[in-house]
Amino acid sequence: MTGPARSGAAIRGAGRTVARGLIFLIQLYRHMVSPLRPATCRFVPTCSQYAVDALDEYGLIRGSWLAAARLTKCGPWHQGGWDPIPERPGCRVNCQDASDAWAVRATRGESGSLV
């Protein structure tokens, strides 16, 4: 690998490292700070678990975006409830691989590129 391909791989590797660091900090919060406070999260999974899942599944950029969007829902203006991370496009319960993920083009309003 040379040139842009190599630098792209290095950037992805650095992103994974930073995402792992954020997950470590969230886990520290969950095990050191959160037990000292009363349970107030109105969502399932909790916001911290959601952030860990999003960073693990989608990586640094999109995972951070999803976690930040979830935190904006925190407050009395949102009723809470079940709110898991979104599925990857094209993957369903019985999905064995992602080879068919881009077979069908998304229609207007179905693109997952912004969130």
Swiss-Prot record:
Please provide, in alphabetical order, the Gene Ontology terms of the cellular component aspect for this entry.
plasma membrane
Its localization reads:
Cell membrane
Q: Do the record's keywords include Isomerase? A: no
Task: State one Pfam family annotation.
Answer: YidD
Which family is this protein grouped under?
Answer: Belongs to the UPF0161 family.
What task does this protein carry out? Could be involved in insertion of integral membrane proteins into the membrane.
Keyword Signal found: no
Question: Which InterPro entries has this protein been placed in?
Answer: Membr_insert_effic_factor_YidD
Q: Which UniProt keywords apply?
A: Cell membrane, Membrane
What the entry lists under NCBIfam families is as follows:
membrane protein insertion efficiency factor YidD
Q: Native species of this protein?
A: Mycobacterium avium (strain 104)
SMART domains found in the cross-reference section? Haemolytic
Major site of localization recorded for this protein: membrane
According to UniProt, the name of this protein is Putative membrane protein insertion efficiency factor
Q: How does it sit in the membrane?
A: Peripheral membrane protein
